[in-house]
Amino acid sequence: MVATGKGRVLLAYSGGLDTSCILAWLIDQGYEVVAFMADVGQEEDFEAAEKKALAIGAAKFYLVDLKKEFIENLIYPAVQANCIYEGVYLLGTSLARPVIARGMMDVVVQEDCQFVAHGCTGKGNDQVRFEFAFYALQPKIKVIAPWRDPEFYNRFAGRGDLLAYAAEKNIPVFQTAAKPWSTDENLFHISYEAGILEDPNTCPPDDMWKLIKGLSETPKEPERITITFTKGIPTMLTIHPAQTQHTPPPTTSDGQCITDPVEIFLTLNKLARKHGIGRIDIVENRFIGVKSRGCYETPAGTILRKAHMDLEGLVVDRNVRALRDSFVTTELSKILYNGFWFSAEREFVQSCLEKSQETVNGSVRLSLLCGNVIVEGRYSDSEKLYNAEEVSMDSVTDFDVSATTGFIAIESIRLKKWGEARLARGETVKPESVYAKRQ
């Protein structure tokens, strides 16, 4: 017999086998269930998912378009900060979780839900990211995590148990040839993990990669673009007409110009996919303490990071950039990966980020070719930290080269003291004395 009256649950619903069974199981447990789907740019048959959820027994179904919010409030701040985890991962999955969680909490308030449920596994990062966000935005919310509930995971020990339950509940299951890995997609990236990828020495099959062309399929001629940034945010994309290498470099007004923030990002996605840009295969350290292997395709994000970092070299003060790199970039990347986006520390770090980006105004010319993002030039008409005449070997300006003698003398005082000390210890200038000793 079905229990009744336990309360209202908002379920993060994907339309797949797991969350469809969770939806039916929650109803069996006596909950009224509202199903929620976020459109963050993934390829999905949302209409079919809605019909399926309502047929299973969901009281209501919400589909919320969060693409613009995702780009403007998560992706572009990450671009400003040059966010990266462990030197390689551009945080595509992590970036989507705060915006999905916020959308869910909005519906929780509208529908007066006492509970929220998700289908995250008990070994992954996403359970942490979602639940931290839920509690930060709605401290009194109660979370149901079936894959951490013994009653659920003991009953559904494998896919066969889920399929049997789906048949019992008349849940339609779209049968396809099962791919031996799992995926998670949004407009920033797609991730592949689990299954055959759990062996870190297994080469991913060519047909796994969904978004980005293999290098053998990419054009053999470069495509030239210019990205214009305002305070570190991309505000214009110019796609230049095909030209020979003998013509003058293109200007920002030479070609098709796109200024809508969403369209800029989506167009860069298409260009990067076409030219084989943005694939990685890594082993990373999860927040919960285990290592995992992940393969990622991050097309537009790869181009934007290269362009943004290059422009910063032209327009950002040396010490400001060093502080941003050592503090803001590393801390915001950890905040994103570990699920602390909605926190006091993120607000503080982001306020520092915004200050660091005040001078990041200008344009970067790029060439896209065979998996490479090649910088061909950069320009800013408002920021004047770079002075070509000042650094020229062929001109004398206000830079007094004789002053360098004093600079070297002062900076080398401590080096001379260090050198005197090592000579006093009997050390020499031989290689075995001056270089690091190997154990």
Predicted regions and their residues:
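Nucleotide-activated chemistry modules centered on ATP-dependent adenylation/adenylyltransferase
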Residues: 2-12, 17-439
